[in-house]
Amino acid sequence: MALTIRELSETDYEDILVEWWGQWGWEPPQKDFLPNDGKGGIIVYDGDVPICAGYMYLTNSKVGWVDWIISNKYYTKKELRKYALELLVSRLTEICGLVGCKYVYALIKNQSLIKTYEELGYIKGDSYTSEMIKVL
């Protein structure tokens, strides 16, 4: 079955993504921390089963940020999951280019996901040691 991609909807954050972050033991980011209040990304499906999703921040420079990649931990088709993640990152990256970005940035810790980004032409920048966030 072919995979399909669609934009995130108003309810995907609560209905799907929060559960996925929980499956992986991660704290979900606040909805208003994400692009377009949680709707600024895309989701990949295998039929009616959601596999993975991710976000794209656009900036006031030529930089786009592709991040917050998350997947359904219990989706068991390993090869299709890998392909879905590649498709997700590739499509988000393509969208960045279409809207005028010259550079695409990502902050990733997961080694498997780092490998996916590298396979798609991303190169490693500096290794960071701390994420710094301040809530105003």
Residue map of PLM features:
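Conserved active-site tyrosine of GNAT-family acetyltransferases
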Residues: K115-Y122
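Short amphipathic alpha-helix that is part of the acyltransferase structural core
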Residues: M1-Q30
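Conserved beta-strand in the GNAT
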Residues: I43, V49-L58, G64-D67
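Conserved beta-strand-loop-alpha-helix junction that forms the acyl-donor binding cleft
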Residues: V104-K115
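Conserved catalytic-core motifs of GNAT/GCN5-like acyltransferases
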Residues: L107, I123-L136
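Conserved acetyl-CoA-binding loop-helix of GNAT-fold acetyltransferases
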Residues: K78-E94
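Conserved acetyl-CoA binding element of GNAT-fold acetyltransferases
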Residues: K62-L80
